[in-house]
Each structure stands twice: as structure tokens, then as C-alpha cells.
């Protein structure tokens, strides 16, 4: 029996049998601030979620966002501030590549539980799905890392956290939630990383029906956390984006609008 633990019922959930160690484990480590990322320390005054629309350096990495290297043996996704449809956004291009971009923050999700973002994808590989390691590509992911009480970790999860800290020198987030665009998994599906229960995925877009236009999302991260993990969320320590196509070796391109938290749905 596979130790992968799908949290979705039905035929699609029953087919989830393969592990996805490298990509997701690296994302987990990356959000923990892994020293192997070889990136500069955070800029001063960057303890907030910087908006892409406020950036002035077209063609460069947005201020307060840092590269999140997923695998040193594969190409990295290219991220830059760009203009698209009359707005200043983050443009991502992956040609068989994988890497993310993250912004370190310190926020209480109970004060501002609503996470808002927009993204645009013009094409989706319908083979790609976070359910299988050999197909684990996604044109867009928005990732949130949470603090928490490590004394509540199961022995298995504690061992995983200790391994991450031993390898990286940094403490892993207590919980990592990824909002993903999947090629075929149903929306609102939830998946759990097999090696720890503290990394989970929530599918917010699926298939190609909504490609070619800007899509807007508003998610209550407190409610999503309760649904996905159970319990109450701790402080938010990082937000990241990820466009990758390293498993299927395809071209993937996306545009991310501002990512912001607020205390209301509107």
C-alpha cells in the first residue's frame, strides 16, 4: 500500500499512488529559508507582502521577493516584473524548469484572513497534475507558510522537521499550504504530501477552460487551514509563487497580479 494520502474521494483520488519527494520537499525547505538557496538576505523594510503593481524595475525581480531554488540539477524558472494588459505584474516563464519566488512576511492570519490574488495562464498541459510525481507540473501556485506549535507534531512529522533543520540549518514551517492550478484534478481537491502531514495542496483551478484571461481569487486562509489541516493557523511567515514544467519538459508561462491580504472579502 502506498503511503501517499489523498484527501479527496472518488475515482481521481483513488488513483493517487506515487510519491512526489523532490519538488514538494524542496519547496518546503525553500520556504524555510534554506541556506543552499544562495540568495542575499532580505532587504530592509521588507517585512510585508510587496505588490507587483508597485514595482518600477521592469525586467527585474520585484523588490522584497527572493528566488526559491527548487533543484540545483535543473533549469530555473525566469521571473520578472512586466507589463501585461495595461498592468504591472509578475511574468514567469518555465522551459522544463522549476524554481519559485518568495516574500518573507510576519502576519497574523486572524487579523487579515482573506488572501486575494489574480493570475493569467494562456495554455495548460492537461497531463500535468500534482497527484503524480512524474507529472507534477503546474503553471501557477500560490504558497503560504505558517508557524505553529511544534510540540503538536506527530513523531513522523517531527522526524521530517528535524531532517530539514539538520540539512538546511533552518527550522521548517509548521505547515505549508499550496493553492494550485492543476491540469485535471477537480477544484477544491486536497492532497497531502506523503512524507509529512504538514504540507498540503488545495486545487483552485483545473483544466484549460479558463485560460487566456485574468482570473481573480479570494480565499479565507483561516477557513482553508481549518479545512485542510484541522486546528487553528499560526502566523504567516512566507508567501511564494511557483511556475514549473520540469517533469513533462514543456513550456509554461504565467502572469501573477498582486497578492494581498485583507480583513474582508471585498
Residue ranges and their predicted role:
Residues 1-17, 24-32:
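N-terminal secretory signal peptides
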Residues 77-99:
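Short carbohydrate-recognition loop motifs
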Residues 52, 239, 259-261:
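Extracellular beta-strand elements of beta-rich domains used
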Residues 137, 147-195:
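Extracellular/luminal beta-rich ligand-recognition
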Residues 92-111, 124-127, 196-204:
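Secreted extracellular polysaccharide-interacting domains
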Residues 35-70, 155-156, 160:
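Extracellular carbohydrate-recognition regions
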Residues 254-264:
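Exposed low-complexity, polar/acidic, P/S/T/G-rich flexible segments that act as propeptides
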Residues 139-142, 197-207, 211-249:
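Extracellular beta-strand ligand-recognition surfaces/modules
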Amino acid at each position: 500500500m502506498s503511503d501517499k494520502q489523498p484527501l479527496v474521494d472518488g475515482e481521481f483520488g483513488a488513483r493517487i499512488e506515487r510519491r512526489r519527494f523532490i519538488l514538494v520537499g524542496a519547496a518546503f525547505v525553500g520556504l524555510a529559508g534554506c541556506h543552499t538557496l544562495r540568495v542575499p538576505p532580505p532587504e530592509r523594510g521588507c517585512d510585508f507582502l510587496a505588490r507587483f503593481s508597485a514595482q518600477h524595475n521592469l525586467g527585474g525581480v520585484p523588490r522584497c521577493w527572493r528566488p526559491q531554488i527548487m533543484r540545483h540539477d535543473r533549469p530555473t524558472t525566469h521571473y520578472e516584473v512586466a507589463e501585461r494588459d495595461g498592468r504591472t505584474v509578475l511574468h514567469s516563464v518555465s522551459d522544463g524548469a522549476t524554481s519559485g519566488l518568495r516574500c518573507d512576511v510576519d502576519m497574523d492570519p486572524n487579523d487579515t484572513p482573506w488572501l486575494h490574488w489574480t493570475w493569467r495562464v494562456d495554455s495548460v498541459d492537461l497531463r500535468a497534475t500534482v497527484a503524480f510525481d512524474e507529472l507534477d507540473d503546474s503553471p501557477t501556485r500560490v504558497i503560504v507558510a505558517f508557524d505553529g506549535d511544534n510540540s503538536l507534531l506527530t513523531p513522523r512529522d517531527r522526524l521530517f522537521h528535524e531532517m530539514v533543520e539538520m540539512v538546511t540549518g533552518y527550522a521548517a514551517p509548521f505547515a505549508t499550504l499550496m493553492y494550485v492550478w492543476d491540469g485535471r484534478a477537480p477544484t477544491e481537491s486536497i492532497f497531502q504530501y506523503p512524507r509529512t502531514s504538514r504540507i498540503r495542496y488545495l486545487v483552485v483551478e483545473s483544466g484549460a477552460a479558463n485560460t487566456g484571461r485574468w482570473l481573480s481569487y479570494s480565499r479565507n486562509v483561516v477557513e482553508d487551514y481549518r479545512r485542510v489541516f484541522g486546528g487553528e493557523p499560526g502566523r504567516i511567515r512566507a508567501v511564494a509563487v511557483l511556475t514549473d514544467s520540469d517533469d513533462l519538459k514543456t513550456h509554461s508561462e504565467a502572469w501573477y497580479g498582486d497578492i494581498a491580504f485583507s480583513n474582508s472579502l471585498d
